[in-house]
Amino acid sequence: MTNRLLTFTHQSPIGHWSVSVWKTDPRLSEMVASMWFGEGKTAYQRDRILPSGQSQLLINLGPPQYRVEPGPPEVRVPFVDVWYSGLHQGPIDTEAPHGNALLGVAFSAHGTFPWLGERMDDLSDRIIALADALGDGALSLRERLLNTPALEARFECVERWLLARLKPRTIVHPAVRWAVDRIAATGGRIPVEDLATQTGFTRKHLGNLFQQQVGLSPKSLARIHRFRGALALLNSGDGQVPWAALAEQCGYYDQSHLINEFRRFTGFSPADLARRDRPDSQSVVLR
């Protein structure tokens, strides 16, 4: 096993699985936040993926998984090969009744634009079969991975594929890259007007660049980062949460604002969410 691969295992009443994280090629560091492979079986039926401020390339190397559209009527959409999940402003419910073997590439907020070269607001809040956007090349990548048993070699194969697809003429504007980094560094607490002033653009022009190259407005991305910051603090506590202090620390107007944002991004109040099983920082068990 190379020093680029780190594997974690989990076993508890909610299931058993392993997650391997790959240290990404430096040439991809501007666009890729992480690469990972998860495999195992859960004891629960359904989970909810929470907004993260990242988009995902997901390659299914195991049994079918399902995205659940709430309806009514409720619809289970199967995913069996390769798909792309854009930046989301709400939760996604999923099921993996037969276990999973999933390789993922998490893109930074501005990381997909140099790779797909499309308007990102056309892909936000959407999940698409990648073959619909890229043709059969996405499916041939999956076939190569299925025929490559070593995990390290699988990650290297995906890296080569990503590097080959980079579009030199599709470059993220430096102001967008800087603003995305500032939003992340401040936990979403920097005012959009300050971002515009410091980039030298009007708020409208910066917003248009964000819609094109990120897929969300600066304000929407900042809301996700504020939520993630509050969620991290909630996870690190001992169950006795001073809600008003948490709201102030994370940049919310008051406790009511915090609760409303949690309901928007998770479907639960903070207190309800804290009582639920959490397989990882990105999801919550529904049933």
Identify what each model region corresponds to:
Residues M1-R203, Q213-P218, A232-Y253, S269-R287:
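Alpha-helical bundle regulatory/interaction domains
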Residues K204-H205, I224:
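Hydrophobic alpha-helical segments, especially transmembrane helices
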Residues T266:
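Ser/Thr-centric signal marking residues that sit
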Residues F210, A222, E261-R263, A274:
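DNA major-groove recognition helix of helix-turn-helix
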